[in-house]
Amino acid sequence: LKTDCTHLLFLDSDIRWKTPEILRMLAFVEEAPVLCGVYPKKEINWAAVHAAVMRGVPADQLKHHTATMVVNLIGYQGAVAVPGDRPAEVLNAGTGCMLIARHVLAAMAPHVDTYVTDTMPIGGGTIQNGEVILEFFKTSIDPETRHLLSEDYHFCHVWRSLGGKIHVAPWVALGHFGSYLFEGEFLKDT
């Protein structure tokens, strides 16, 4: 909030993405001010691979059925119907690809913890010693479920507790670099 930027975009360095898909996210910022691309965890979901084999998925297509995606759905009951060209509401998603409108951060600011820095910047850093930092992203425990919330899920939890919504962009196809390129498709793997 120290600048006049209108959005904050997280794109992790280990995420493979396509520019047109990311730019398209901006078209939905009014209806979906927190909009995420869904990407696979760095693991192979062997149960999903087995299920795909049993359904007769060709060997050259199995890589699209290996993923456990970094997203949690609202009221998931085993079947997902998401329009592929519109944002879809979810419980939470990862910051590996997350677009946040400035007004979201401004609305959250009075409701997040703060701390004061105690380090001196080296090399002309922008954060000064003694500056108050807003802690939008931290780990926490969900008071209802007692689940551990990672930094990205904590952010989503706080925004939802203030009446906001988290959306995903199903048209964004992301890969996650690890020991190899983990791939998956949100509509197929959830």
Locate predicted features.
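Short beta-strand-to-loop acidic/aromatic patch adjacent to the donor-nucleotide binding site
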Residues: C5-R16
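Active-site-proximal beta-strand/loop segments in catalytic clefts of secreted hydrolases
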Residues: L11-S13, V38-P40, W171
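C-terminal catalytic/acceptor-binding lobe
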Residues: P110-T190
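Conserved catalytic core of nucleotide-sugar-dependent glycosyltransferases
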Residues: K18-K138
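Active-site charged/polar residues at nucleotide-handling catalytic sites that mediate phosphoryl
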Residues: T3-D4, E30
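Short, Asp-centered acidic motifs that coordinate Mg2+ and/or phosphate
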Residues: H7, A32-V34, I166
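Short, conserved alpha-helix that lines the donor NDP-sugar binding/gating region
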Residues: L1-K2, H157
